[in-house]
Amino acid sequence: MTLRLSRRAYAEMYGPTTGDRIRLADTELLIEVERDHTLYGEEVKFGGGKVIRDGMGQSQLPAADVADTVITNAVILDHWGIVKADIAIKHGRIAAIGKAGNPDIQPGVTIAIGAATEIIAGEGLIVTAGGIDTHIHFISPQQIDEALASGVTTMIGGGTGPATGTNATTCTPGPWHMERMLQAADGWPINLGFLGKGNASRPQPLVEQIEAGAIGLKLHEDWGTTPAAIDNCLTVADDTDTQVAIHTDTLNEAGFVEATVAAFKGRTIHTYHTEGAGGGHAPDILKVCGEANVLPSSTNPTRPYTINTLDEHLDMLMVCHHLDPSIAEDLAFAESRIRRETIAAEDILHDLGALSMLSSDSQAMGRVGEVIIRTWQTAHKMKVQRGALTGDGARNDNFRAKRYVAKYTINPALTHGIAHEVGSIEPGKWADLVLWEPAFFGVKPAMIIKGGMIAVAQMGDPNASIPTPQPVHYREMFATRGGALARTSLTFVSQLALDAGIGARYGLAKRLVPVRGCRTVTKRDMIHNAWQPAIRVDPETYDVVADGALLTCEPAAVLPMAQRYFLF
């Protein structure tokens, strides 16, 4: 006997299916479900009178043969596709993406549910991989709370707290500081990796930081990013399979952008602030987007270009880089970094896939809790101003959505050698997952899962008779408590440090995971974001031309995902 349901009734019961479209928050972005892994009529759903009951959707299989957790009927948005599926989690990892149920009585089951299985209802929800922010100034540990609640589950950067050096640069300098920060990482329910200070012209000061646990090195102009330092740092990175991040020379003191590119010698490097106002060679740091060995990222304070962007940047810059507005030279330095034309071009370079990643620059001109919001605001602005991308039609923005989600998930993971563990929703990877109601997509997650366990969720009054009464706000869950914290989050280190036994020597509780493949990744590997245009920036007008086309756009006066969502 067949019961026919309308699309509306089906979506209300099991969530959208193939061909259904979903609006992301209050943007003009629409995604369309490309495939549904379920068999119609064999869907599983938990609740009174529902399917997942003993002998029905729940099998008699033992714990070893069933999922620990199943997220049912969720829409997955990832770089590889937009699909409807059940997601299985086992031993803290994504075990399968497919059709859940009882294989004894249901056809097509690829994920077995048993008495050992917990259920998270994904009907009507979007699931994305946990975000990865690769430009963190570890100025205050409270950043981690903000980042996690926004959907970021991995933070990479450097620092030691509100020291003057950390306020300006993302470096954890030296073995002593590295050990202390790795010990501090044990106390936070998020994946962490630290960058050492890369500004040295001899190898030993850099190698000892890698041996102490750094996953890479950071070159920053405030410490002197000279060609000699660049060359030495990249040589050490090549020897240790670690990544180098660079904030280039705004003042062009040690050379222009061409000198910096020459110092790279074709070696892989992550260029921070490949953007319109964040720093680096003025005014033409954007040129490095065209280099095959350069993995470019930009930060969120200029994302997207709005009518307020220029005004707020000057004061931020003076504070973050320890400048004095009463000193003419300091003021000139600041003003050289803030350019309307290059900020506008940054929007378009993101939309066309020339800029591969987006990060925060936390408390150092950027907002740690707004990486995901500002990524999707940029995508919305570009759709409104530039129309559909090649590959998208009138019905959906699937390709644009895949391009933008890759900027804060898989591409940062590939860049820093952690894609074997995190960065996408694929079997075998660490189960860092973010669940969103479509109306709140990108703004306020419904739930954040770390290593297969709920870490943060929107939760009502703990003294209420049910979970939903006000006040509803983000509260830490059991994955953040006791020994579970160290079992659900990872600390990334170098292979050199892992081989040296720093876990036991430092007394670390979290699992240490070595980075790998940092020196072989290239711009071509940046998923959906691999365009290498020839860029020219006019030294007088700052106009940006890419492959012969002038890149310019108007600032936005109104944005989605903004005040409508933050009344309190």
Curated annotation (Swiss-Prot):
Cofactor: Ni cation
Catalytic activity annotation: urea + 2 H2O + H(+) = hydrogencarbonate + 2 NH4(+)
Subcellular location: Cytoplasm
PROSITE patterns documented for this protein: UREASE_1, UREASE_2, UREASE_3
Modifications the protein undergoes after translation, according to the UniProt entry: Carboxylation allows a single lysine to coordinate two nickel ions.
InterPro entries with a match to the protein in the record: Amidohydro-rel, Metal-dep_hydrolase_composite, Metal_Hydrolase, Urease_alpha_N_dom, Urease_alpha_subunit, Urease_AS, Urease_asu, Urease_asu_c
Functional pathway: Nitrogen metabolism; urea degradation; CO(2) and NH(3) from urea (urease route): step 1/1
Free-text cofactor note: Binds 2 nickel ions per subunit.
A GO cellular component entry from the record: cytoplasm
Keyword Zinc-finger: no
Domain Urease: 130-568
Listed EC numbers: 3.5.1.5
GO biological process: urea catabolic process
Positions where N6-carboxylysine occurs in the chain: K218
Annotated substrate binding sites: H220
Gene Ontology terms, MF aspect: nickel cation binding; urease activity
CDD domains, per the entry: Urease_alpha
Residues the record marks as active site: H321 (proton donor)
Positions contributing to Ni(2+) 2 binding: K218, H247, H273
The organism's place on the tree of life at top rank: Bacteria
Binding site for Ni(2+) 1: H135, H137, K218, D361
Protein keywords: Cytoplasm, Hydrolase, Metal-binding, Nickel
Family stated for the protein in its record: Belongs to the metallo-dependent hydrolases superfamily. Urease alpha subunit family.
Subunit structure: Heterotrimer of UreA (gamma), UreB (beta) and UreC (alpha) subunits. Three heterotrimers associate to form the active enzyme.
Entry protein name: Urease subunit alpha
